[in-house]
């Protein structure tokens, strides 16, 4: 896995986890303030190894750590718009 691939996957997981937490506020309540959150993918041991190494390097003394084990990441959808219709008009 290249550095770029690791960065891209980390960014995607962080974004998706943030969206998940916004939709499921009970998750946010389980994360201690100031915790280091480490996102791991069940089907990607190479990514997980790098994520853990990075977390170990970044963790501050006494900082709580929360491991989030993600079963899988669904493929992205291109858009959430449903059947948009365009209309060319000469004026409003």
Question: Predicted regions span which residues?
Answer:
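Terminal, compositionally biased segments used for targeting/anchoring and flexible tails
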Residues: 1-92
């Amino acid at each position: 896995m290249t550095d770029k691939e690791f960065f891209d996957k980390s960014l995607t997981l962080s974004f998706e986890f943030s969206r998940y937490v916004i939709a499921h506020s009970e998750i946010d309540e389980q994360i201690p303030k100031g915790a280091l959150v480490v996102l791991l993918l069940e089907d990607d041991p190479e990514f997980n190894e790098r994520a853990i190494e990075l977390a170990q390097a970044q963790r501050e003394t006494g900082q709580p750590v929360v491991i989030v084990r993600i079963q899988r990441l669904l493929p992205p959808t291109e858009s959430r718009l449903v059947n948009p219709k365009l209309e060319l008009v000469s004026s409003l």
